[in-house]
Amino acid sequence: MSNVRLALLLLLLLVSCLPALHALTFDPSGAVLGEQKTVVLLVEFSDAAHSMSSETIHKLIFAEMNRYYIEASFGKVSVAGKETTQWHRLPFASAAYDLAKPTTSDRERIRFATDAVYAADNEVDFKEYARVIILSATTVWPATVRMNVATHDGVIVNRAVIASESISLSALVREYGRLLGLDYLCDQTLFKAGRYPGAYLGSWDPMSNCLGFDEFGRPEKLVHFVAWNKMQLGWIEQSQIVKIKPGGTNFTSLAPLGSGGQGKLLVLIPESSKSYYMVEFREKTGYDTNLYDHGALITYYDGKTPLRVIDQNPMTSYFNDAAFDFRPGRLPVYVNPFTGFSVIVLENKNTLLKLMVSTAEKGKIAGKAERAIAEANSTIAANRDQGKTKGLEEADGFLKLAIDAFTMAKFEETLTLAKQAFEKALGATFPEAYTQAGKLLNQTRTKLEEAGRKPYKSQEAVKLLEKANVFYTQGVDAYEEGDWATALDLAQKAQALIEEAFRKEDEFAKQQETSRFLIISGAAVLLIALAASAIIQRRKKRK
């Protein structure tokens, strides 16, 4: 055996025999509560100096990340500590570690983390800390490293986050979650089937996206952990979990998972002793304001593989629209025929989600009722867009009653009322104002065209016609927008102005005729007077 191997064995033996060793580890079966004392090791290389200030890094970890964990844990966890006072230089150049790729081997990561711990060992008293973060001046693919490094303080560092100095907040939260004992929520079955990066939980949990961007290639947004993770860490109390066995009918209400930790937060439906379905309410509040969608998020844990999302819209290749909800464009009913249960979203008040967990058969009836509501609603909307509003008030009334019946889980009654709403919507017609306005606008157009074919001599009439044309144009716009009453009013005003213009033109023509008559009459009188004067003059000369 070589001297080097012998020395290593003696070192390991010595380390294993030290009585005062304190392991920085995590018991997955226990809760993570209280202040998490964290040290940040800043490291650089002979060929790569740092560019970020320690103040910027301190703010990222002990202000921004701390703020996130306080909210996500409902005040049960905070992050405190400090970064090293200097950037410690590692013994090898940066290229020797090859840490920029996600495919970097664990051996290389462990070597880097070990060198970082040793480099900072003289400065840091590791007994004061429970968590270790190592930030490098070079590009490092974020990861959590398992290792076994003994320090001068009698501490074994067995886990640490390694990342670049420029790590994003969302990536930092994810890797710190690994330090707390959480797993990456990557569904490898879906991943291998080609749903990339939708093979994760989409954007519903920081632990589900290890790529740094969402399913559409956009930078990921920081949201709350799913209820499963919060339950594992002890942040959700047992009194906040509603356990419902399949087979019966139960009603419950959930508070939003990101609203502060008050009320019921999780419905748990066991499938077996190790597998179960979970329902949580995700609403745009707190960090969950960054969610792309909201509603009842249903997840499944089979006891072995990572958590899976039950997708209400499996036709899309992403999970951003996976939540169930009672609103247009979403399904409120999940039916599991194998386990024999259903989850029905009865009402979403934004601050409270009303749920019914029942049999699969009841879920099928609820699904029919919801589809009847959707059909009636779409028919009403289509007719309203076309302008067929006469009769829609009755359809709207029946639809409202149907929705009210659904929220009270009266699904048979919902079906009846929704069908009545649909039938009333089918019978909707255009209102009288629609017909009258259309007819009058056509008449107005004809009169304006007629007026345009002849010259008008009255300036007052011309101005009236110009104003009538403005009213006509505005009336056509209102008609196209479905404002029949305004269109009718404008058409009537245009008609009145046209009639007034015709009258003014007639008056002007009569005035012109009268003026011509007076001129002719005056000329005739003058001629007669002149003739008479001439006759008188001739008579005087004869005398």
Residue ranges and their predicted role:
Residues 1-8:
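Bacterial N-terminal signal peptides that target proteins for export
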Residues 9-19:
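Bacterial N-terminal signal peptides
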Residues 17-27, 538:
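Sec-dependent signal peptide cleavage junction
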Residues 30, 39, 44, 49-52, ...:
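Non-catalytic C-terminal accessory/binding modules of secreted extracellular proteins
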Residues 51-109, 203-239:
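Predominantly extracellular/luminal regions of secreted and cell-surface proteins
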Residues 72-156:
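Active-site-proximal segments of metallohydrolase catalytic domains
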Residues 126, 131, 136-289:
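Extracellular hydrolytic enzyme modules, especially secreted metalloproteases
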Residues 358-543:
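Long, charged/polar, soluble alpha-helical segments
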